[in-house]
């Protein structure tokens, strides 16, 4: 090594030795229990479902510190009550947070006097969305409604009193006031007066966005301000359903499902959208998913029956109807759909018993229409005419009912009503034909997925073909009725309409020959 190299090495080494040493950044001290309590309180006011779960978890951990235990326990009670309410509002699987809140309250030596009342309200108040309370679907739901009705005045007064000072009380006051008929005369501003001190909290802003109606702008603003408000997607989907924006609704429900899979109201909502979109296989899959989560979900059972019926799976539909009847909910609907599937299998005696039972529980046009069809197949023509007449009275726009009523009158050789009814039925069926063609044009021009478009168009072409055969039958039977009534010009007019028809042509030509 040369002398120059030695000098260079010495200089370099000396410079390195003189360089300042890197100092590691100081580790911040851990948050104190008081700071952690404040952070958990902030999560409660933030109001999103995940925020509430995080707050509950933090309060639970803080209960191990003796000097923070009471405040942390009260915080855990508050968070548990809010989680329980949110789960019921959203229709999530309820995980016993009301019971946890009651258990925690029993460990505190001094609780606010209003707290037991608020927790009773959390337990009893039905789920609601946009002010619309969900229909009870179990004996437990009915008992909750009874308790709420009996205690409404006492509970509402106590909860309203506490609403200005506590987030749980404020949220429950608004949950009660926004959904019950007893407060319908108050404006929304009046409903929110007791919670004015908490009005800046997103927790309260969420209630403002869902009080009496769902406000898409307010909901979107909440999600923009705090992306953790994932539950907003469900409510936005409900708004889309109300606006008949089914693809947008499906997207919002899919976002909600991606966030929480254990969510039966979302899986059922996806199934309902698929049913309306005529995607029956997808609808069935999500009704089945709903029933995996909630085996006695009666709305999903009824939806499953409909999906199976439209898929032509009669035996499975009947078995599902049996399940629904055993639960003693929607018995009339279950009897109707069971009768419909039994009639498809030509079990007409069983179908008749079911449709007659349905008639005692449902007042609509569909039940007597089905009864008319079943009676016709059982060769009970007078009974059939009676049921079709009732169905037509209840829904004069059902062309098929009108058609069958005319056919039965023709078979009974009651020519005057047969002729007049069948002329009207044929006109009605022609209007249906025109409307289906317009629907096909609309579907073809839409941006729906190609597979869905093809299925919907194919289904309407089947309806058109069926309707045209019914029109041909109506024209021929009208010709027969008019011939027997000596209304020769009308008999000729309607016979000519089917003179070239493969089914009726020869007989129509025979009528025309007799008229010459």
Range-by-range predicted roles:
Residues 65, 111, 161-165, 197-198, ...:
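Structural marker of alpha-solenoid helical repeat scaffolds
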Residues 55, 96, 101, 151, ...:
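Single-residue signature of alpha-solenoid repeat helices
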Residues 41, 78, 82-85, 121, ...:
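Residue-level recognition of tetratricopeptide repeat
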Residues 49-52, 91, 98, 184-185, ...:
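TPR-repeat structural position
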Residues 34, 71, 78, 168-171, ...:
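Start-of-helix register in tetratricopeptide repeats
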Residues 45, 82, 242, 276-277, ...:
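Register position in tetratricopeptide repeats
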Residues 75, 172-175, 207, 235, ...:
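Canonical tetratricopeptide repeat
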């Amino acid at each position: 090594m040369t002398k120059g190299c030695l000098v260079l090495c010495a200089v370099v080494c000396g410079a390195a030795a003189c360089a300042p040493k890197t100092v590691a950044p100081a580790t911040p001290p851990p948050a104190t229990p008081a700071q952690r309590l404040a952070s958990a309180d902030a999560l409660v006011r933030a109001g999103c479902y995940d925020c509430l779960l995080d707050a509950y978890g933090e309060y639970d951990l803080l209960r191990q510190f003796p000097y923070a235990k009471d405040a942390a326990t009260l915080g855990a009670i508050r968070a548990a009550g809010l989680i329980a309410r949110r789960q019921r509002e959203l229709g999530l699987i309820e995980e016993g947070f009301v019971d946890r809140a009651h258990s925690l309250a029993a460990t505190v030596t001094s609780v606010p006097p209003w707290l037991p009342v608020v927790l009773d309200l959390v337990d009893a108040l039905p789920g609601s969305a946009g002010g619309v309370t969900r229909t009870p679907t179990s004996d437990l739901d009915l008992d909750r409604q009874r308790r709420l009705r009996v205690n409404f005045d006492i509970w509402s007064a106590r909860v309203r009193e506490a609403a200005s000072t506590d987030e749980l009380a404020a949220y429950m006051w608004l949950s009660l006031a926004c959904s019950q008929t007893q407060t319908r005369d108050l404006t929304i501003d009046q409903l929110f007066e007791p919670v004015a001190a908490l009005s800046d909290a997103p927790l309260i802003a969420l209630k403002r966005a869902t009080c009496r109606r769902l406000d898409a702008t307010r909901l979107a603003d909440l999600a923009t301000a705090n992306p953790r408000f994932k539950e907003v997607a469900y409510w936005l989907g409900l708004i889309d359903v109300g606006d008949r924006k089914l693809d947008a609704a499906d997207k919002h429900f899919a976002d909600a499902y991606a966030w929480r899979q254990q969510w039966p109201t979302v899986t059922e909502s996806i199934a309902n959208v698929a049913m309306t979109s005529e995607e029956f296989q997808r609808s069935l899959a999500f009704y089945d998913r709903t029933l995996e989560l909630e085996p006695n979900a009666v709305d999903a059972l009824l939806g499953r029956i409909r999906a199976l019926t439209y898929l032509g799976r009669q035996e499975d539909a009947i078995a599902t109807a049996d399940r629904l009847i055993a639960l003693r909910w929607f018995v009339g609907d279950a009897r109707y759909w069971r009768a419909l599937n039994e009639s498809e299998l030509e079990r007409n005696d069983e179908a008749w018993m079911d449709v007659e039972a349905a008639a005692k529980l449902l007042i609509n046009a569909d039940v007597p229409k089905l009864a008319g069809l079943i009676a016709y197949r059982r060769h009970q023509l007078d009974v059939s005419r009676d049921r079709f007449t009732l169905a037509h009275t209840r829904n004069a726009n059902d062309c098929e009912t009108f058609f069958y009523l005319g056919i039965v009158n023709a078979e009974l050789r009651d020519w005057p009503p047969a002729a007049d009814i069948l002329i009207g039925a044929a006109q009605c069926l022609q209007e249906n034909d025109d409307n289906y063609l317009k629907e096909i044009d609309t579907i073809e021009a839409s941006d729906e997925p190609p597979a869905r478009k093809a299925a919907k168009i194919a289904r309407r072409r089947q309806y058109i073909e069926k309707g045209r055969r019914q029109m041909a039958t109506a024209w021929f039977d009208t010709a027969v009725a008019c011939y027997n009534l000596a209304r020769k010009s009308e008999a000729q007019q309607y016979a000519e309409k089917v003179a070239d028809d493969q089914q009726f042509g020869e007989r129509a030509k025979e009528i025309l020959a007799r008229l010459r």
